[in-house]
Amino acid sequence: MIIRDKKKADYLVFLEFIDEADIFLKKYLNELESADKFTIISFHPLVKSYLLKHGIVAVDSFHFCPTASHQKLLCVLEEYTEQIRRNCCLKDSTGVEDSYVENLIYSIRSILSLWLYQIEVVSNTIEHYLPETVVSVRPEPIYIEQNIWIGNNERFIADIAGQICNAKKIVFKSIALQIGSRNFRKMISRGLKKKLSGILYSTIQVISNPEKKLIIASVIDFGMDKVLNDLKHKISGDYSFAVIGLPFKAAFRNMCGLFTKNIPDYGYLPCYKNRNINGDSEFVEDKNKFSKKLIKIINGWKYRGVLIGSWLNQKYKNCLESEVIDKTYGHSYHLNRYLEKWKPVLVLSPYSRLFSAVLGELSCLRNIPSMMIPHGTFTPAYDEYSKKEWNENALGIINTPYKYVAVQTPLAEKYLSGVSLNSKPVITGPLLFGRQIKRLNDVVFLRRKYASDADVIILHAGTPKHRSGSRLLNYETIDEYVDGMVSLVNAVSKLNRVHLILRYRQIDGLSSETLKGLLPESDSYSIASEGAFSDYLSITNLLVSFSSTTIEEALQNNIPVLLFNKYNRYQHIKGVELSSGSSGLF
């Protein structure tokens, strides 16, 4: 346990969202005058900030999921996912097979990571405080969103706490919270976009007729547009370039460019990848067998006395079967026809998840050269637990069905040397990240915005995982991320002629303004959310991070890196240890 002082609590309260904190305050406002009676565990900085405005201090959840807990949970995750891989398989008429199981595991693993973390925190907290009464907020009705992730209306902490309290014979009180299950504005907007996209797709299919050898990319995310532009300028005029997936606005601009002087560097050749398609009778029969095996497996899942199989069973029947299995079938059907029609000579992608996983598998089945250009960092793992997480993550980014994989950094090369690889490595140097920074005159003005030329600038950049994309051990939770910032601000405030820039992207609704309210008052730091990261990296003297692609961005540009991990939980790369013990500075 990270928190070592042990005190008995009369009331132990678990809160995850602001609406839960609000209804809790309304119910217990008078009793909260005796603050010592209540210990509140916050699962999100927004809750902590909201309570602070009412003069109430909450304890962050991550304190009750220490290193040993993360390691244990990764072993449980590995056991569960391997049960699926060993016992469940599904193949369609195009030959696509691995994508069904891997796409499902990708979604299930994220869901399980959140649930297991919450179970671990609630269990450890109850054992630590030995409360007389546990309080949590239960949403009504229980709602399963049509989403392959866990949505904000899908809340399970009250059920978790209730099961644990029942087993330990502790009084449990739940507060009912009415939650609107449908956002009609979003539904209408989504429906209109789908309709307009269909019209746009049909128009493009008619007017597009690439006459040259075609190179396609799955998306332009993570800098893939730069890769396409580089290719266009470096290879002969015998090739044309196109993207399968573009956001609606970008797709519209791309098409308009065909009729104006603003001709885009790459074309837009969409695929009807999300259009529903009924499976053939053989596939439907195989899918039913697959689903029965899967449900039998997950119904047996229980962790620390909490039944999680029933939740996942419901999630699968209501959502994952249609949104993962059926959509993977649709991707396979439509992408197979797409590849047959356009006959690309090369397929590129920055990741291999969902439709891009099917694209990679089909490319290999059809003997179309394909290359994975990983959008994220991969480094050699130095312990068996972080290795479990990295190897699983690699299946969608660097160890994929694509025939080739671009090796962009020496650390990626070292990582690949230690795994059984599906792809052929090609040393390309930096493509999506780690490129040499061009120091422009504008950067001088950016630096002077924060500090004088004689001052030292420290840049903090991290990649915490939001609630719907939970990951264990190798990434910070969002409350742990903010806690680290607090410590950095306190440390830098004691230094002369040093300024800390917190490079922050809004996550899970936590705005820069709310974040500032959680940080100490100091003139020694600034929060930067706008502009290109490369510009900020070019003005920094030292990068500070937990685990992020920004680490390799800095190292590739000869900028020193400080791995900052207060609780010594994870070491992203080997370095010189500056401070040992609990500080976790490397």
Feature roles, as predicted:
Residues 1-586:
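Catalytic-core helical/loop segments in enzymes performing group transfer/polymerization on anionic/lipid-linked
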